[in-house]
């Protein structure tokens, strides 16, 4: 692998069998698989000055390994994903835990047996927990919106408490919408856990942190003689879609294109922009992440050395996250797609414009306008690369 800032003089896209736009999970996975499986020469074009996408991490002045774009916690149920990523990193045994600061009391999130006892006291908390067990069984995740629909006064009491103190205000801060306006695929990610396990991902068999960090993982993944990486390159300056064809520097490009950027930006927002939420980061607590679910302006604080396992006496780095609406072409980072029927229809209109381009493959959270965990986007890229490989094997 060679990483270059900008495109060299005389760059010829036709020297490459595949162009990948974006050096995050989706792009890096596809680049690696096509290079090593069918011998594709691959050019990876990355708009930012670094690889690894939003998983990028670096050592700050205090020596703390910081996730620049907010905390990324690896977890998966998918054995194929885990085996693939494990080729490029060893893992530390990190089990992520999150606390919610509810009016000064720190409670485990997802809301669980321990949270019930803290919120309602020992006696009432146990009564409510038995009702949850009788209704749903132990070690079950129950989405908060499903719990609210139960016609039972005890379950309604739990639902109302969690909704008001853990879910409602945090959700409005993060998304700028009320829960009933938010797509169920998002609200379903906020469950009540009927059990005592206070890990954030209690049932995921594979979880941890890359031993040397995420950036090192990506460096290893992209380390291949047939892969060239060009940072500080905006693919929109050379790549266009016209009449069912991919043009690069105005000429038809016959190789494969894996595109992981926003589709609306590829077309200069000519049908309108797809809304996102973005985060401002403002760079001492018992766990890696504390969610502030009630009154504070920020959504959460992360203390990174609690996640990386670094021992740095007297030194720490925290990050506060403030969520607000994303402004396209402003230099902000689009984090969370605001998925609702209107936005979905707009995305489908953009997607239709590339659907007939057989060598153009949109993949990833931006290109698919989805809320993606790291393991899910990795799996999506593995499946896409399977399809491309099958056409060239």
PLM feature spans:
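Mid-domain catalytic core of redox enzymes
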Residues: 37, 237-353
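N-terminal Rossmann-like FAD-binding beta1-loop-alpha1 element of flavoenzymes
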Residues: 16-44
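Dinucleotide-binding Rossmann-like beta1-alpha1 core, especially the glycine-rich loop
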Residues: 62-135
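C-terminal catalytic lobe of FAD-dependent flavoproteins
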Residues: 333-393
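Active-site/ligand-binding neighborhood in enzyme catalytic cores
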Residues: 103-107, 113-255
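Glycine-rich FAD pyrophosphate-binding loop
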Residues: 35-61
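Short catalytic/ligand-binding loop motif for oxyanion handling, primarily in non-cytosolic enzymes
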Residues: 52-54, 102-103, 107-110, 117, ...
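A short, basic/flexible loop-to-alpha-helix module at the beginning of a structural domain
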Residues: 1-14
């Amino acid at each position: 692998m060679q990483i270059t800032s900008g495109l060299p003089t005389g760059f010829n896209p036709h020297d490459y069998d595949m162009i990948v736009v974006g050096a995050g999970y989706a792009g890096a996975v596809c680049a690696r698989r096509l290079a090593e499986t069918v011998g594709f020469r691959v050019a990876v074009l990355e708009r930012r000055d670094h690889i690894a996408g939003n998983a990028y991490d670096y050592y700050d002045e205090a020596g703390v390994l910081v996730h620049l774009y907010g905390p990324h916690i690896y977890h998966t149920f998918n054995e194929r994903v885990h085996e693939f990523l494990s080729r490029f990193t060893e893992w530390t045994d990190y089990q992520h835990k999150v606390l919610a600061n509810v009016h000064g009391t720190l409670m485990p999130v997802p809301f669980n047996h321990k949270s019930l006892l803290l919120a309602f006291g020992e006696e009432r908390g146990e009564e409510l927990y038995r009702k949850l067990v009788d209704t749903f069984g132990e070690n079950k995740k129950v989405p908060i919106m499903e719990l609210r629909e139960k016609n039972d006064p005890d379950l309604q009491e739990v639902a109302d408490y969690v909704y008001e103190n853990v879910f409602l205000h945090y959700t409005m801060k993060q998304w700028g919408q009320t829960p009933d306006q938010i797509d169920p695929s998002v609200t379903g990610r906020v469950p009540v856990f009927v059990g005592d396990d206070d890990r954030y991902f209690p049932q995921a068999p594979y979880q941890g942190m890359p031993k040397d960090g995420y950036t090192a993982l990506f460096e290893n993944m992209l380390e291949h003689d047939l892969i060239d990486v060009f940072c500080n390159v905006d693919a929109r300056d050379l790549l266009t879609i016209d009449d069912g064809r991919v043009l690069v520097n105005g000429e038809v490009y016959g190789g494969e294109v894996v595109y992981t950027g926003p589709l609306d930006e590829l077309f200069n927002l000519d049908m309108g922009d797809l809304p996102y939420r973005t985060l401002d980061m403002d760079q001492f607590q018992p766990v890696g992440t504390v969610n502030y679910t009630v009154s504070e302006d920020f959504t959460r604080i992360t203390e990174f050395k609690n996640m990386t396992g670094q021992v740095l006496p007297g030194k720490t780095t925290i990050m506060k996250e403030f969520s607000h609406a994303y402004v396209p072409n402003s230099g902000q980072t689009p984090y969370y797609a605001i998925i609702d029927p209107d936005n979905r229809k707009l995305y489908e209109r953009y997607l239709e414009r590339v659907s007939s381009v057989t060598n153009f493959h949109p993949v990833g959270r931006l290109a698919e306008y989805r809320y993606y965990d790291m393991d899910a986007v990795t799996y999506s890229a593995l499946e896409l690369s399977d399809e491309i490989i099958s056409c060239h094997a």
